[in-house]
Regions:
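Histidine-rich, glycine-flanked metal-binding segment
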Residues: 2-10, 17-62
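Divalent metal-coordination and catalytic microenvironments
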Residues: 15, 34, 56, 67, ...
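Short, glycine-/Ser/Thr-/acidic-enriched flexible segments
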Residues: 18, 23, 36, 43-44, ...
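Divalent-metal coordination cores built from histidine and acidic residues
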Residues: 76-190, 194-202
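Short low-complexity, flexible loop/linker segments enriched in glycine and/or proline
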Residues: 105-116, 217-222, 226, 262-266, ...
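Glycine-rich tight-turn/loop motif centered on a GG-T
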Residues: 115-132, 136, 174-182, 215-229, ...
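Active-site neighborhoods of metal-dependent hydrolases
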Residues: 143-147, 153-155, 159-169, 176-182, ...
Length: 502
């Protein structure tokens, strides 16, 4: 199109345009009233209110982030600039069974927003309490109405969160202590069906061993969705199937049999119609090489002509790097000895120090930390073969000090710091020490004999003032690309907005 003058709000010129599966082309794109009105070479710019020269830049449809935890962030920053700046124009919220569809759900004794989010997302309870105080709705319809009133940046699609659905139907305590009655299960099915008709895009559930409550006396319990038996999940997903909606789920990580049984619910052959299912996550876990292969095998099996499923695991297109503050980290939750520290409130330094100083706890921690690292046995063999049970590999060389009161340790990996501590205590470090480092070693680290002693003392000395990072999955970018480009997997699991420090 050349020569023709047309009214254009925005003309983007000379961009490399990617659209669907088409070969990328260099062209102009004209936009009026928020809609593309023409594409082509050398569009006349005389009628354009704004012209952008995009030479050397890419122009593409907005990205769709299918796995976010922006539920609370939307209430504070509804524009979601951290996503829109990357070109994301649509997000899905209320993943992994947690969301705000039913409001604050307080019952006078328990505060579900605080209980469910504090440890899962590492958010201080005071912040969560303030968020819950400002919630004015109590039904799925009212929540959608509320979202419509926000100045949203991207489009927002909402799942109905199963943990909150259980709380709404069974009460908080009932949702984590018993199965639903027949009438309660029917009530959940009815509420889910009604929500899907309102515009909720599906149901989210969760079975990962990282998601625990922050509500006494139930800090040893996982979030409500994980107490659902198979028959409950089957009944609810049947409602999702009937309405052509989506089930977002996570697998029972430690049981291949339970995983296969659960995800056979996607089968059209067994259930008359495929259930659209998206699952977290197809990751190349550093501590267990089998899991990424299992994800691909599962995808091929469940989508095969034999099973006739509609099953897509989400693949993350980046390294899975986790930041932690002292012992406060999501990956600690599946290890009982580390979980005890996570059960304390974020602000409770004294509580964590008391645990870390208890002789029985010290014994248990050291046994956990050194498991598989010494003496031959099944644990040592599994570590050698890289098929361990936990996502966190407890390898000092893989853990990097990001922030620390002892400033010269920042940027070092924990193994280097440990070696330095031993060199100082054995008086064989060939460099001059600062007074502060020497005093720290003398007062806190002089009795360190092994790496378990060292880890315990790092947590005692610095608590949450010690920030560190580790890459738990997707270290090999070649494997990441293979997963991302697999036609049976979906780009996703960004976990945007999840885990405050991530």
């Amino acid at each position: 199109m050349t020569g023709k003058i047309q009214k254009i709000d925005m003309l983007i010129k000379n961009a490399k345009v990617f659209n669907n599966g088409e070969t990328a082309v260099i062209e102009d794109v004209a936009i009026t009233a928020g809609r593309i009105i023409s594409r082509g070479q050398q569009i006349n710019d005389q009628g354009a209110s704004r012209v952008i020269d995009a030479k050397g830049l890419w122009l593409m449809p907005g990205l769709f982030d299918i796995h976010t935890h922006y539920d609370l962030e939307l209430e504070i920053a509804p524009g979601l600039p951290e996503s829109t700046r990357h070109g994301t124009t649509s997000v899905v919220i209320a993943n992994c069974s947690l969301g705000l569809a039913f409001g604050a759900q307080r019952d006078g004794k328990f505060d579900p927003i605080v209980a469910c989010y504090a440890r899962v997302e590492n958010i201080p309870k005071s912040v969560l309490t303030h968020c819950a105080d400002n919630i004015s709705w109590s039904t799925p319809q009212a929540y959608l109405d509320h979202l419509d009133q926000l100045n949203l940046g991207p489009n927002v699609a909402v799942l109905l969160p199963h943990s909150m659905l259980r709380i709404e139907t069974m009460g908080f305590e009932g949702s984590i202590t018993r199965d639903p009655t027949h009438s309660e299960l029917q009530a959940m099915k009815d509420a889910l069906g009604d929500a899907l008709k309102l515009g909720y895009v599906g149901l989210s559930t969760d079975a990962l061993p990282f998601h625990y409550l922050a509500a006494q006396p139930h800090c040893d319990k996982t979030i409500p969705t994980q107490f659902a038996q198979y028959r409950e999940i089957k009944a609810l997903t049947e409602v999702v199937r009937e309405q052509g909606a989506t089930w977002q789920a996570t697998p029972p990580k430690d049981s291949v049999i339970d995983t296969l049984k659960t995800f056979m619910l996607t089968s059209g052959r067994l259930h008359g119609r495929p259930l659209r299912t998206t699952v977290v996550a197809a990751l190349d876990v550093a501590n267990n090489w089998k899991l990424s292969r299992l994800a691909k095998i599962l995808a091929r099996l469940l989508n095969s002509p034999l099973i006739q499923g509609d099953f897509h695991m989400q693949a993350l297109g980046a390294r899975f790097k986790i930041w932690s503050d002292g012992a406060i980290t999501p990956i600690a939750e599946e290890i009982p000895e580390l979980r005890r520290l996570n059960e304390t409130d974020l602000e409770d330094r004294a509580g964590r120090l008391s645990i870390l100083s208890d002789p029985d706890y010290i014994r248990d921690f050291k046994a956990m930390w050194l498991k598989g690292k010494h003496r031959w046995g099944i644990s040592r063999l599994k570590r050698k073969l890289n098929i361990e049970d936990y996502a966190f590999n407890r390898k000092l060389a893989d853990m990097t000090v990001e922030l620390c009161p002892q400033k010269n340790w920042q940027g070092m990996d924990f193994q280097s710091v440990f070696d330095r501590v031993l060199a100082i205590t054995n008086d064989c470090l060939n460099e001059e020490l600062s007074n502060t480092e020497q005093q720290l070693i003398n007062s806190d680290f002089s009795q360190v004999k092994d790496e378990a002693d060292f880890m315990l003392q790092m947590l005692r000395s610095f608590d949450t003032d010690l920030s560190w990072s580790t890459i738990t999955a997707n270290r090999d970018l070649k494997t990441v690309r293979e997963l991302l480009m697999d036609p049976l997997l979906l780009p996703g699991f960004n976990d945007s907005g999840a885990h405050l420090t991530n």
